[in-house]
Every structure is written in C-alpha cells, then in structure tokens.
C-alpha cells in the first residue's frame, strides 16, 4: 500500500552515522467521547456524587480552564453501572479494572499499529522489534506479547515492555526505538503507546482533591510508529521525521512531585503544587543541552511536540522558553481535541504536525521548520527530549 502522504527521500544520514527515522504514524481512540462541558454531569452522576455540590462547581471550573473540548473513553455509563466498584471511591476494584485493561489496552494498540503498518506499506514480516508503553494496568506476559500475537508478528520479534513510566513514556519509547534501529542492521521497530483510564478513574473525594484534577484531563488513546534507519526508498519507504538525539533528565528537587501507587482501588496519583514551576524553571537547561550540538538557541526556530499534561504545563514551559503561540498550534490542538492521553500524546502531536504542514502548504513536515523537539514530561519529575529533523513535503 502506498503512503498516504508523499515525503522526500531525505533520511537524516550524515557524518557516516545511520540515523533512525519515523517511517509511519497511526493513531486511534475509542469511539465513545464526551464533550468537556458535559463531563461534570457525567462524572458526578455516574459516581453517585451529585450531593457534593461545592466540589462539583469546583470541578466545573477546572474543566472550563482546561481548554479541552472533548475526550474519548472506553468507560461508558453502561460499563460503569456494571462495575460499581470502579465508580466508588476506595472500593476494592483492582480485579475489575485489570479485566478490562488486559484486553482493551492491547486491542487499542493493535488498532493504531494496523494504521501505522498500512501507511508504512511494507510486509508485516519486516518488523523486527516491538516497544510497547502503557501506564494502564500490568500483566505477564505483557501487552508487548499480546500485540505481537494479535498482529501475527514473527515469533522471533524482540520485545521491550515499558510499564508504568507515566506521561513521559512516549519519549522513552522513541529513545529506545532509536537505539534499536541504529544498532541492529535492517531493524524495523514497531512502537506502540496505548492508554486507558479504567485504572485511574475514581469518584470525587474531599480528602483527595488530586483525583478531580486528573479526571478533568485524562483520556484514552493509542499511537503507533514504525521506526527504522536507512529507509528503503526502492520499496516505498519514506521518512516522516528523523530522530537526531534523545535524552532523559530528572528535574532537580522534584522528588515526590508526581507519584502514583497501586491499591485495591486501582492506581491513585498524587500531585504537588510545584509541578508546573519545576518543569518551567528547568526546561531551558534541558533544551540547551539537547540543541547545543546543532548550534540552535532560538527556540522559535523549532517545531514542537510538548506533552500536553495540562494547559498550565504548556503555558509554563512555553513561557520560560519564550515560544510563540504559532509554534504550539499542534500541541494545543491535541490537548483540546483529545485531552491528556498519557504516553500517546506526543505521537498524536507529531501526526497533527505533519498533516497540518501538508494542508497549510508548508515545505516540511515540521510546519516549515527544519529542527524540532518532542518533549515528554511526567513523574520523577522526568523530562524526555527528542531532537527531530523534519523532511521536505513533495507538494
């Protein structure tokens, strides 16, 4: 199958080094979605919390300020009625959550993977590695094994499973895939990030207000990428983005700023008030280290895929770096149309970037710019910085 979009054969090779490239992207969401303006009623009604009127008003204000228009979910009103433990704060519902996630997470990942494979246009037998990331449940063998079987991949496929890394895991998965692609001749790596909020859905509770912050943002989605070095142009492979470097940094002084723990009630997360300033005040050092080899210091000369962990985080990071709104359109679009899908978000943004660049007549997949940065943000606090190079679009 021919690629849906035509790109240059540029593959980022230089100075004798094989560079990994993104060769295809696929994304998907559950069909069920809820408009953000309707979510407070849905949430409080289905958790039998309508009597908590003051908390509901607070939740409404959080939703309004989120700049999210809609979110997609596996959990529907019917499913919540059938699983009252999930909708009851503190109830022992881990078994019910796991039953959902063990099936639905690989299934959603499979849907995204099939889209990426179709765009790639190569035989599925060429996939040599799988990297699967999720913070939605856990099992043995893992979701990496299940999706390998669902897709009918070779039994010799080499798998990496990244469980419970949190929202920065999209960057982690790309970093691992880059190393695999560049250090294994002919490797083609299927990267899958799939998230389902069944593990973190909780009823509101006055003594744990972090819950309602997450309920106003988190959502379900999956993204898949094919990563490889030296695209086989003769067979129709084309780079979408080139991956120049990838790094991970623990933010100093951030221990305990975002944590999550598993209980009989599922996964419960805890947020400190200084999350935004910690990311904001430390992002410049990360960017300087990532881009100094390229001699880049003008942050507005780049395109961006910033994990949309919330409007405040985007505003904080962008404000510190002086990034103009025009360079954040794709990031804010994904936040608005999908919410925070955890590890999958940054890949949705890459997909939006290359598609909007084509629609708007830009010369490259990076909104007309040559270099860009994918920024994963999450627990630790941890920052993943993936330096990308766009490729020319053949108009």
Swiss-Prot record:
Name the consequence of residue 167 to A. Loss of activity
Self-association or partners: how does it assemble? Answer: Homodimer.
Chain's role: Type III polyketide synthase involved in the biosynthesis of benzophenones and xanthones. The preferred substrate is benzoyl-CoA, but can also use 3-hydroxybenzoyl-CoA with a lower activity.
Q: Which Pfam families match?
A: Chal_sti_synt_C, Chal_sti_synt_N
Q: What else is known?
A: The T135L mutagenesis transforms the trihydroxybenzophenone synthase into a phenylpyrone synthase.
What does altering residue 135 to G/A/V/I/N/Y do?
Loss of activity
Which domain of life does the UniProt lineage start with? Eukaryota
Family to which this protein belongs? Belongs to the thiolase-like superfamily. Chalcone/stilbene synthases family.
**pH dependence statement:** Optimum pH is 6.5-7.0.
The protein's name is 2,4,6-trihydroxybenzophenone synthase
Which PANTHER family does the entry link to?
Answer: CHALCONE SYNTHASE, HYDROXYMETHYLGLUTARYL-COA SYNTHASE
Entry EC number(s): 2.3.1.220, 2.3.1.151
The annotated thermal profile of this protein reads:
Optimum temperature is 35 degrees Celsius.
Alphabetically, the GO molecular function entries are: acyltransferase activity; tetrahydroxybenzophenone synthase activity; trihydroxybenzophenone synthase activity
Q: Which residues form the active site?
A: 167
What top-tier enzyme class does this entry carry?
A: transferase
Q: Which Gene3D superfamilies match?
A: 3.40.47.10
Quick check: keyword DNA damage in the entry? Answer: no
Q: Some GO term, biological process aspect, for this entry: which one?
A: malonyl-CoA metabolic process
Q: Which UniProt keywords apply?
A: Acyltransferase, Transferase
SUPFAM superfamilies named among the record's database cross-references: Thiolase-like (SSF53901)
Query: Is Acetylation tagged as a keyword?
Result: no
Which InterPro entries does this one have?
Chalcone/stilbene_synt_C, Chalcone/stilbene_synt_N, Polyketide_synthase_type-III, Thiolase-like
Which catalytic reaction applies to this protein? benzoyl-CoA + 3 malonyl-CoA + 2 H(+) = 2,4,6-trihydroxybenzophenone + 3 CO2 + 4 CoA; 3-hydroxybenzoyl-CoA + 3 malonyl-CoA + 2 H(+) = 2,3',4,6-tetrahydroxybenzophenone + 3 CO2 + 4 CoA
């Amino acid at each position: 199958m021919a690629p849906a979009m035509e790109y240059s054969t540029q593959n980022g090779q230089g100075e004798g080094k094989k560079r990994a490239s993104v060769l295809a992207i696929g994304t998907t969401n559950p069909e069920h979605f809820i408009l953000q303006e309707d979510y407070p009623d849905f949430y409080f009604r289905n958790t039998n919390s309508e009597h908590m009127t003051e908390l509901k008003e607070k939740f409404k204000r959080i939703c309004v300020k989120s700049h999210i228009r809609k979110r997609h979910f596996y959990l529907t009103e019917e499913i919540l009625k059938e699983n009252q433990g999930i909708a009851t704060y503190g109830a022992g519902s881990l078994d019910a959550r796991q039953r959902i996630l063990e099936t639905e997470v690989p299934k959603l990942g499979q849907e995204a993977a099939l889209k990426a494979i179709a765009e790639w246009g190569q035989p599925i037998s060429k996939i040599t590695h799988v990297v699967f990331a999720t913070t939605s449940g856990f099992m043995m063998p893992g979701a990496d094994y299940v999706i390998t079987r669902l897709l009918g991949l070779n039994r010799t496929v080499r798998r990496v499973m990244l469980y419970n890394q949190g929202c920065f895991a999209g960057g982690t998965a790309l970093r691992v895939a880059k190393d695999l692609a560049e250090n294994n001749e002919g490797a083609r790596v299927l990267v899958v990030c799939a998230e389902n909020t069944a593990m973190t859905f909780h009823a509101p509770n006055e003594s744990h207000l972090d819950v309602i912050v997450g309920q106003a943002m988190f959502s379900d989605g999956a993204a898949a990428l094919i990563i490889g070095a030296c695209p086989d142009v003769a067979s129709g492979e084309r780079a979408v983005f080139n991956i120049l470097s990838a790094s991970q940094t623990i933010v100093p002084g951030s221990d305990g700023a975002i944590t999550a723990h598993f209980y009989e009630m599922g996964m419960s997360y805890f947020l400190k008030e200084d999350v935004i300033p910690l990311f904001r005040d430390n992002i410049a050092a990360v960017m300087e280290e990532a881009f100094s080899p390229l001699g880049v210091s003008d942050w507005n000369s780049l395109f961006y895929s910033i994990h949309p962990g919330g409007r405040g985080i985007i505003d904080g990071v962008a404000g510190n770096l002086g990034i103009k709104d025009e360079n954040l359109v794709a990031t804010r679009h994904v936040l608005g149309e999908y919410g925070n899908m955890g590890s999958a978000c940054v890949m949705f943004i890459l997909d939006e970037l290359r598609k909007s660049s084509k629609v708007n007549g830009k010369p490259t997949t990076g909104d007309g710019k040559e270099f860009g940065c994918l920024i994963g943000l999450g627990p630790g606090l941890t920052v993943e910085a993936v330096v990308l190079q766009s490729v020319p679009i053949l108009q």
